[in-house]
Amino acid sequence: MAITTAGDICALYPLCPILLHCSTLMHLSPLRNTPHVLHAAAAVTEYAFVLSTLVFPSFCFSLPSPFPFPEGEGGAFYVRLFLNALSEEVLFRAYIPERLCHHATSCTARACGEVLSVLLFALAHRPAGSATLFAGAAGAALRVLFVREKKRSGSRARASALCTAVHALWNAYAIAAAAR
């Protein structure tokens, strides 16, 4: 399967958190006899994926409007919409804040990690223009929802699923409203 269009590249964007998670496992849980070069490669890969979140959304926002859908394309669009929401939730609500705050001992350090993850989420939405501020506020609200649900249920997966559903529904509503 060849990648031929901008849409194909954007469809690959949701794979970033999966690859990020795999490289992080290698980086955080090094095997005893693994060469240091592999650990360095895992760390570079991890940070490259995090930084790519600031590039790929810009590229995806520049795609032409999907409306009206070509025949049979509506379902694929909404699947992509869901997968993009899932990848952003895993990355910006679970991975980045918890990675930044993992060794933080002070409230100030934890707050800086939380604020940085919200800023990165807003920056990833900068092609939306003035809606970037709204995206930052929504990112903060989704992080609060994530933390509360994780505390209530004890499950990071359940918290991610809830935030993904809210995020995907909002994106679907916003895109449909903009198309009118």
Curated annotation (Swiss-Prot):
<feature type="transmembrane region" description="Helical">
    <location>
        <begin position="37"/>
        <end position="59"/>
    </location>
</feature>
<dbReference type="Pfam" id="PF02517">
    <property type="entry name" value="Rce1-like"/>
</dbReference>
<keyword id="KW-1133">Transmembrane helix</keyword>
<keyword id="KW-0812">Transmembrane</keyword>
<dbReference type="GO" id="GO:0080120">
    <property type="term" value="P:CAAX-box protein maturation"/>
</dbReference>
<dbReference type="GO" id="GO:0005886">
    <property type="term" value="C:plasma membrane"/>
</dbReference>
<protein>
    <recommendedName>
        <fullName>Uncharacterized protein TP_0335</fullName>
    </recommendedName>
</protein>
<dbReference type="GO" id="GO:0004175">
    <property type="term" value="F:endopeptidase activity"/>
</dbReference>
<dbReference type="InterPro" id="IPR003675">
    <property type="entry name" value="Rce1/LyrA-like_dom"/>
</dbReference>
<keyword id="KW-1003">Cell membrane</keyword>
<feature type="transmembrane region" description="Helical">
    <location>
        <begin position="128"/>
        <end position="147"/>
    </location>
</feature>
<keyword id="KW-0472">Membrane</keyword>
